[in-house]
Amino acid sequence: MQEVDEREECGMYFIPHLGVYRSDKKTSKLRVVLNASSATTNGYSLNSLQYNGGVAQNDLFLIMVRFRKHIFAFIADVQKMYRMIWINPDQRKLQRILWRENMDEPIKTFELSTVTYGTTSAPFLATRTLKQLALDEAGNFPLGSSVVMSDVYIDDVLTGAETLLEAKELKNKLINIFAKGGMVLHKWCGNNTELIEVSENYDFSDSSEIKVLGVYWNPKHDCFSFRVKIDLHELNTKRDVLSTIARIYDPLGLLGAVVAKAKIFLQKLWMLKIDWTDLLPDTINREWRQFVESLQVVNDININRCIVVEQPEVIELHGFSDASQSAYGAVVYCKSITSDGRMLVHLIASKSRVAPTKQTTIPRLELCAAVLLAKLVHRVKQALKLNVTNTFLWSDSMIVLSWIRKESYKLKPLWLTGLLQSREMTSSEQWRYVATEDNPADFVSRGMDSLKLKTCELWWNGPKFLMSNQYPQ
């Protein structure tokens, strides 16, 4: 920032600011927070007049799924990214602040010269700048440019490679490409000690857990975990229920069965027309307390980050769908096989939706689940960018499977839209029947307690037949 004259000019804006202290932060415990939404005397604020610019990066789901395919994985952070990007000098008068170093000095006027936190356009300006940097340097650093375009979320880099040598090379390419934009990568951390030098390791011990886009990652054991803060009350309101559910941050749906149960419970409260501040009825309150008590087990669950074996010869995706009167959902697994026959099957992601409050038939809901699965598998393929050998889609509804295999002109208009959506992303040959007891999507259609989920092999690794070469026909 730079000091400017205090004289008034047309079209300027002063951004209010205050300090916020966060004791849980490893660095920058005291941060300045700017409020560009504060209205002036004419009723407008800077944020009310700005466009947000849209999205210039891949969404979080794609980046997190892709992060799970790397044998050697590492993360980094763009140091002070916003402060590395200049604002047009003609527009800096819209980013003025009042400041003084201590209480004895007079208040001075400054203009912020760079992209500023708290403004509506800041995320787009920063991420679009990174995209432009990647485009400009694509000729010099094609590998680094590709990663900047696909594996960066805001200022967080999550990427990796299949071999240690490739990972080291990628790391150096990223350092060089960001240096071209005057930026520095720091807070390095990886799942291999040879990949990240001790001096770069941001003081993390081997056993430390690092927060990666809201999910905790233990690089030593290379696994994800969750930290859900639980407040157990004797009596609860609908507001308490929603507050607790909102704390379960699970972008990939790894806890999808637990989240589905929470969604179903919340819909039940809406059906009872309970106000936000009303206490829950005794039976409902007891049910909720049991759920919250079991929810603490979530913090003990560890999930492998990497979902593929080293040097896979065959990679298969297996998706499952199911529905009940309460909800419907889809689950996707990755099966990888080496040339010597070693197999690995891991849960990739899940999605669930509560059923409409209007009475709907089970076949109709099963169709919704199949469409949801088709979309989820399409997104997973888009994220992984792997050479998938085969894709298998499983449903325990013979009715839906018969609809999928029928010619379009033979279908009722009521089902046609969903089936056409499914056919855009899948082929009828990929769909197969699975017995209900072997269908892990049953858990996202009905929900499950955390205690049962922790040890549920069917959820984490899919049905046992995936570990063989013989599948149900």
Task: Indicate where each model-derived feature is located.
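Polymerase palm active-site segment centered on the conserved acidic dipeptide of motif C
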Residues: 4-7, 71, 75, 159-223, ...
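C-terminal reverse transcriptase regions that engage the nucleic-acid substrate
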Residues: 44, 61-68, 111, 148, ...
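Active-site palm subdomain of RNA-directed nucleic acid polymerases
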Residues: 123-169, 173, 375-393
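Catalytic-core region of right-hand nucleic acid polymerases
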Residues: 2-128, 225-268
